[in-house]
């Protein structure tokens, strides 16, 4: 099992992908201990002095004006967790739950939350033991933090709710803790609120969408290059000079990726020497422009989400150096919601452009290939309905890409009167990614079929590798057969990131 030494506020995108991708052991760097202890000492000093501070010895939300006696502070924190665990829907998978917990550990360890090191270590213990809290997918509006999902996460620390160990059966949390060799904990002043308040669920949802978008982008570049070759499209639109004079960095970098794949030393490239074709359709010619714009959106979202993954986003915040506790609004996940909306646009456009290239391949006048990429048309329908499936998926994504950040519903008796809807903004990215992966699967199949039909012509070594990868699982389409398994096989290869390995990373 891999290990990660967590330096608070210093997680990288590659580390976050590692956290999401598989179980690992977390160790908190000792440099964090002093700041954590100082913030707790500040909270204890406020209590000892009899001062009133929101979240430490008051109620919450609209009840913030209610002073809580010292004798009730432990019960206050426990009641907060129990009452706020009100989510609905299917539980999050182990990978997402683990990412949420690590994001929360990272935030709390910055030393601005007034939470004891022992509580943070208890959360680390869940991660290291492979304990997954039952966290329903729905129930947060992304302000005042992701209260419901983080409450469900925190229930497990208290021995409440449900959890499972290393992908096993869901159990009462006390049984899951016992199986993992762990004990329930008791929360002190402010600790329940520190656990519940924050954008970690929203950020994890959007990060999953970001990782999917990065993979889809790379796969789409490979599929688009394959289609360009199958359609005998020109390489000239990828000339670096075109893109340099526009100056759009995403476009420049996207064009370089196409050139990386479309080398000049191939039979198809040599076939263009006496070509009379002047211009290709936009779905081939404008790939660097469209995909470059998508890359820019993905990169900008990555920058926002990386900052949020390392942020302190609970409330109130403890500034121990000044012996001060300040109420603010870092729990508001508007940056995450807008980043997720931008990722949605990129995922939708990647699929939309791919679907147009598939349609081009179906049209014999455009591709100069047999209609629907099959011989003996009429008897055989070939890729006809596969393209319809791609169109259906691309169209569905257009609706799903509607921005969520422009929506808001007031909650908590209008105390929380503007919210981000970041969790929903991030969560819909998963369905969109699945749809676009389906579109790309059809394009990969169609491009490979078209290349097969260009008898005697081969493409570049990298693109031949992409064709070979597919042909190991899916044979050439000689006559009509049950088509769905072919699409599923291509989807599985895409999900396993086989095509992304043909390109350098695009976010770093």
UniProtKB/Swiss-Prot annotation:
Family named by the database record: Belongs to the PAL/histidase family.
What keywords appear on the UniProt entry?
Cytoplasm, Histidine metabolism, Lyase
Q: Where is this cross-link: 5-imidazolinone (Ala-Gly)?
A: 143-145
Q: In which pathway does it act?
A: Amino-acid degradation; L-histidine degradation into L-glutamate; N-formimidoyl-L-glutamate from L-histidine: step 1/3
Protein name from the UniProt record: Histidine ammonia-lyase
Localization recorded for this chain is: Cytoplasm
Annotated GO molecular function terms are: histidine ammonia-lyase activity
Q: Name one GO cellular component term.
A: cytoplasm
Keyword Disulfide bond recorded: no
Q: Does the keyword Lyase apply?
A: yes
Name the gene behind this protein: hutH
**PTM annotation (2,3-didehydroalanine (Ser)): residues:** 144
Q: Please report the PTM annotation for this entry.
A: Contains an active site 4-methylidene-imidazol-5-one (MIO), which is formed autocatalytically by cyclization and dehydration of residues Ala-Ser-Gly.
Checking PROSITE patterns in the record gives: PAL_HISTIDASE
GO terms in the biological process aspect are:
L-histidine catabolic process to glutamate and formamide; L-histidine catabolic process to glutamate and formate
Assigned EC number:
4.3.1.3
